[in-house]
Amino acid sequence: MFSIIFIALLILLITTIVMFLASILSKKALIDREKSSPFECGFDPKSSSRLPFSLRFFLITIIFLIFDVEIALILPMIIIMKYSNIMIWTITSIIFILILLIGLYHEWNQGMLNWSN
């Protein structure tokens, strides 16, 4: 038990030292606006290099990722059904699906699924 804690603390210490050294060694000495710009030659740009970003696409992407992870969590529940107690499995599944439906209702109620706004 003591050796496991010692190894964990040693790993934590080593990673902390490596991260500290990396942050010190990676800092730039002189910050110049032209050199920090996305252009390679260092001249002043005529227009902004930032492209407009649609917040709707971002929200739809986040919602898709959330529901994609939920599907990845539901699929193993089907396989586990025959190995577990049916009552506990049913209660767990109902609670999980209820949480999903509450989240979907909240997104719908907030207008995140309405593309026209």
Swiss-Prot record:
Native species: Drosophila melanogaster (Fruit fly)
Role this protein plays: Core subunit of the mitochondrial membrane respiratory chain NADH dehydrogenase (Complex I) that is believed to belong to the minimal assembly required for catalysis. Complex I functions in the transfer of electrons from NADH to the respiratory chain. The immediate electron acceptor for the enzyme is believed to be ubiquinone.
Listed GO MF terms: NADH dehydrogenase (ubiquinone) activity
Topology term for the membrane: Multi-pass membrane protein
Return the protein name.
NADH-ubiquinone oxidoreductase chain 3
EC main group: translocase
Q: What is its EC number?
A: 7.1.1.2
Its family remark reads: Belongs to the complex I subunit 3 family.
What does the record list as coiled-coil region(s)?
A: none
TM regions (residue ranges) = 4-24, 60-80, 86-106
Question: What is one GO biological process annotated to this record?
Answer: mitochondrial electron transport, NADH to ubiquinone
Reaction catalysed?
a ubiquinone + NADH + 5 H(+)(in) = a ubiquinol + NAD(+) + 4 H(+)(out)
Keyword annotations from UniProtKB, A to Z: Electron transport, Membrane, Mitochondrion, NAD, Respiratory chain, Translocase, Transmembrane, Transmembrane helix, Transport, Ubiquinone
For this record, the Gene Ontology CC terms, alphabetical, are: mitochondrial inner membrane; respiratory chain complex I
Q: What is its subcellular localisation?
A: Mitochondrion membrane
